């Protein structure tokens, strides 16, 4: 259960960086479930006692099940600059995952992946899009591996 509280990691006049809550959408969809965009807008509205609508630009996303760090733009100018920076590949994305079982060292996984729209899951399919994943084991404990 999410209580609607957000963890603000950084904030200035242009951006706000928050911890994305696992299993919470980044932006609203047809489920009407809680979403980070709404939570952060609410936070800004309360903190700064803002009347009316709060502008908040969404410049990147994380999948619903994933927790992590997400950056929102507080101005349209910041949104434009951040979007340009992302499209020019000036951002480096680093993902950490905890796996069941143990792996050792480093590796590369390559396959063809295709999204099943009905189940909203990705499967290996020879007609899918080529995908490559490089991983490095950072640690193991209790039959779990951090990569």
Please tell me what each predicted stretch does.
Residues 1-147:
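RNA pseudouridine synthases
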């Amino acid at each position: 259960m999410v209580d609607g509280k957000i963890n603000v990691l950084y904030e200035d006049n242009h951006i706000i960086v928050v911890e994305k809550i696992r299993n919470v959408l980044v932006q609203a969809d047809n489920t009407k479930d809680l979403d980070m965009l709404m939570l952060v807008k609410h936070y800004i509205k309360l903190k700064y006692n803002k009347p009316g609508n709060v502008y908040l630009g969404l410049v990147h996303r994380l999948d619903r099940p994933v927790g992590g760090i997400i950056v929102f733009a507080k101005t349209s100018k910041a949104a434009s600059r951040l979007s340009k920076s992302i499209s020019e590949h000036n951002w480096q994305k680093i993902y950490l995952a905890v796996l069941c079982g143990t792996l050792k060292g480093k590796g590369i996984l390559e396959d063809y992946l295709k999204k099943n729209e009905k189940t909203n899951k990705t499967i290996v399919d020879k007609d899918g899009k080529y995908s490559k994943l490089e991983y490095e084991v950072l640690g193991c404990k209790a039959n779990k591996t951090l990569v």
